[in-house]
Amino acid sequence: MKRLQNTLYVTTPEAYLSLDGETVVVRNDDDVLGRVPLHNLEAIVSFGYRGVSPALMRACTERNIGLCFLSRHGRFLARVSGPVQGNVLLRTEQYRTADDRKRALPIAKMLLTGKLYNSRWLLEHFRRDHPQRLDLTAVGAGIDQIKSSLRLLPEAADHDMLRGIEGSAAKAYFSVFPQLILRNAQDFPFSGRSRRPPLDPVNAMLSFAYTLLGNEIAGALESVGLDPAVGFLHTLRPGRASLALDLLEELPAGVVKRVLKNARPETRRLIN
């Protein structure tokens, strides 16, 4: 059983991280900003540009502590990891399955089933808890469309059909998404999902949360010997962690709930 530890987030751009014995030291020039015992950590995420000492990098790779670098705006830059772990036969089978679309299809269906189920759950949760603040007819129509998409998934003959079903469900989901912004809606307008770059504060928060979560998933995949770049749903592309994105598909509902809960004017100022 894996013991859940803490993640150290270093948000000061000028910070430099080093190792003092068994302690991570965060410095800004001569000022010590913090000291954290290494054994309490399972990951370090740095938004700085000054870097990390080689000694700390080595300690992290030896102890399987994730070390991730993001830009000050939250864009993923790099992740440091140790030697590939796990059984090479596991990765070989992963590659074979991903290369055989018929074998990959059932896995892709399971991933999308989880995504659509959780999307439906989120809408039903808001409909149940906030009936006076929603257009129940529109939200109900969105839920019904997602249910219809769930019924169609088992019959999909290929990945193109899956993407079509997913697209219909996503359109229904995001058509009612603005209603889920119950707090400070005037400060957080939402006109649809946008990426690279996100075009509004809500999209910026979603993309940032997905970046952090995707990094965690990629590290977990590497720790058990799987290749994060070789997935079964997302197409393979250089530089893309396709398998991490596959697994991320099931999780946005929980992320969205937290993002909406923390939609405050001061958050918008931080994003801007």
Functional labels for PLM-detected ranges:
Residues 40, 48-121:
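A surface-exposed, charged beta-strand/loop segment in the N-terminal or early-internal portion
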